[in-house]
Amino acid sequence: MRVGYLGPAGTFSQQALNESLKFAGLGDDAEVVPLATAHDVVSAVQDGLVDRAIVPIENSVEGGVNEVIDALVHDAPDVAIIGEYVLAINPCLIVREGTALGEISTVYSHPQPLAQCASYLRRELPDASLQPSNSTAAAVAEVLASDQPVAALASPAAAEQNGAVVIAESVADHELLATRFIWLSRDPLEAAAQEQAGKSAILFSGAGDGAPGWLLDCLSEFANRSVNLTRIESRPARLELGQYIFLIDIDGRVDAPGPAADALAGLAAHCEQVRVLGSYAV
């Protein structure tokens, strides 16, 4: 079994993978495959290069990870979400040995940690430039390759694995920082007979999305059956300006008989496109 994740070694994605292998039905003998970008991870599942993969989908501060969402919506029609795992995040400021805090001229990291630590960076490093990297571990590699006084935002594990130094611990602006990761596969996990407990992720888009009340009509299919929505957001449909695809998470599995499945059938009557991204136990 080949399992993809956002690499290189030392990323929060690798930490989430290691902590949740058993939840995905995988053993310690799984072959883990680090990939350069989150889009690459999703594409590797779509193209059959890996059997399963884990990617970040949502953060408690910055919200949805658009790179992953767009990859699922537009570039991975055969990929399904089969599970999720929530990881507490503790980004640290990491440097080469001998670099002082006041010397730091540039901070590298994935865009999410840069945003999650924005207040700290403005306060402690107001003159430092912020440079996005493909991943937190890649940011540490950039620090070690530089002869300038630069830093990275990454996990303590990334510092330890690469021989770097943590100069400031837990620098996120919010104490309860967490990221929700999703497990992906080309083979959806079937619900047990009559099993309704769990979660489903659904995307949908118009026919009547330009009409007043259309979105209300769509969501009423769930409210009228007492199906709880836990998340909703929209992404551009990549057609005309102002056209969107909506994504929702709901409590309940739509691949087993019950209110969630009935609501999905009702939703289809209002839409041109409805796709179940995943229906899985939690």
Task: Enumerate the language-model features and the residues they cover.
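Domain-level signature for soluble enzymes in the chorismate/prephenate branch of the shikimate pathway
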Residues: 1-282
